[in-house]
Amino acid sequence: MKIQTLGFDWDSGNRRKCRKHGLHLVDIETFFRQSSLFVMPDIHHSRSEERHIAFGSSLKGRPMLVAFTFRIREEEVLIRPISARYMHEKEAKEYEKKGTEI
């Protein structure tokens, strides 16, 4: 089976969760198109599906994180954002510290 390139899977639920934290769809889609993301499994929330957390920065340089999973629709792998937000100050400092160690 041939799998096409990534797209995004949006519905009213995940749009609402992301907007709640001041982020728009374009912010999140742009975030995933960057090459400087750090992605790790979200083992605490992966009971019914495999979830991941991506750490990186917005185009304006503001640290943010996105919880997401993958969905396959019509042989295309889609990124399904679950929630997205800007990092809290403590998280951002930890991310910056770890980023220098990678």
Predicted stretch roles:
Residues 1-102:
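Ribonuclease/tRNase effector modules and their secretory precursors
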